[in-house]
Amino acid sequence: MAEYTASFGLTAFEYQCGRGVRLGLDKAAALKEAFDAKGITFSVHAPYYISMSSLEEDKRLNSVNYLLQSCALVKALGGRRVIFHAGSCGKQSREAALEKALDTMRRAVQAVDEAGYGDCILCPETMGKVNQLGTLDEVLALCSVDERIIPCVDFGHLYARSQGTELNDETAPADYAAILDAIAAALPGERAKKFHAHFSRIAY
């Protein structure tokens, strides 16, 4: 897998744990060795079960545990970044959902530090469905909780969220500039230069 990834000239690999963190630490160590030899850095996508804005507290607490599991794995793989979806708004307002997510984010940062994973970088991701918590502004709000948090900007998701009215062939240059300007304004300094990014081939 490392050789195949390197054959494309890639230097980063995002290990998917959407259905749960199931990779054993022994296998992770073997992957780390193989990918290190090719100069490829790992990140981990945390489980899709995360719901930082849930109305149910146990689901919010479980979300923190999923992030801890993901941090343990990414460290075993020799990486630092953990990407995750914050969750949906459900039957509450966006404002209420964001407040719950911010509270869960604070708990997550504390738990990550207490578990010894303070060097891990949590990366909330922009989302494509309108009812999901994940506009660029919402993601940047989550990043305000701690200076170690950086955004995962999924440009395909932002395009889908706008139903193709943004980041299309006509508007892309101005839209990309606006996104980068917003990140720079919210995260001054080096953090804005190191945001995580996803690109997907989506067309409306």
What are the residue ranges of the model-derived segments?
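A general structural motif
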Residues: 10, 37-41, 79, 117-119, ...
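A structural signal for the main folded, soluble domain(s) of proteins
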Residues: 3-5, 38, 99, 111-121, ...
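Active-site acidic/histidine proton-transfer and metal-coordination neighborhood
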Residues: 53-153, 160
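Short amphipathic alpha-helices and their capping/turn segments at secondary-structure boundaries
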Residues: 2-3, 24-38, 68-75, 135-147, ...
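N-terminal pre-domain/capping segments
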Residues: 1-46, 50-71
